[in-house]
Amino acid sequence: KRYKSRNQFTGVPSGFSKLDTMTSGFQNSEFIVIGARPSIGKTALALSMMEYIAVDQQIPCGFFSLEMSYELIGQRLLSQVSRIPGNKLRSGFLQMQDFQRLQDAAGRCYNAPLFIIDTPNMKLLDIRAMARRLVANQGVKIIFIDYIGLIVTEDRSAPVFEQVAEISKSLKALARELAIPIVALSQVSRDAEGNEPTLAQIRGSGAVEQDADVVIFIHRDRKRDDPYEVQEAKLIVAKQRNGA
């Protein structure tokens, strides 16, 4: 069977061809971590992947957004699908041709099998329970979580590294239980500012580095004289347990 489908991806494709060639897509039971410094583009990358997975490929996808509301996620997704900059959507300064693009994009987003849960301060146990329901009732094939640092554990007084370890092990176990890929976003430490991130710089790095099957970093070379002017982002596959 693998021989006959040797030119196809065996997992859920991300829509990024070079990444998919390396990973053959996100595989069932894999725990994938996407890490970056704040404001580098973790959520934007995840939304780009979800656009390809759910909107373009019609693969059922779950998204736990612990940082942004359903409305903000909807606006950003609509901007991506319509290819209309977000500032134009927010300001209302649109041209006549934009309205047809918006209408088409809204229809595609509405019909996409993308299930967004935007409950803030969501407990780990609740995420696990909701994920099970999404798979059982909606046939979800992949889940994204934004982001690890906002998941609430049972013992909030425990040291941060212990809480991250509990979350990491639980999400890895959940991916195996549900037999789907789970993609969790994570911040990296301030040490990575201006440099390419390393596995040791993931928040709570020991457990996440051990539990994750794939770790992908986003890196942008910010110009020193203007921190808001950025170059293209680079995706770094720092770990691939089942890769070559």
Provide a role label for each language-model segment:
Residues 1-21:
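N-terminal pre-Walker A segment at the start of P-loop NTPase domains
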Residues 7-8, 86-96, 114-121, 152-165, ...:
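Flexible beta-alpha connector loops of hexameric P-loop NTPases
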Residues 21, 52-139, 153:
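Cytosolic-facing regulatory segments adjacent to core modules
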Residues 27-32, 59:
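Pre-Walker A (Motif I) flank of P-loop NTPase domains
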Residues 35-36:
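The Walker A (P-loop) glycine that initiates the GxxxxGKT/S ATP-binding motif of P-loop NTPases
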Residues 39:
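Walker A (P-loop) phosphate-binding loop of P-loop NTPases
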Residues 42-43:
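Conserved lysine of the Walker
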Residues 162-244:
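Phosphate-binding/switch region of NTP-binding enzymes
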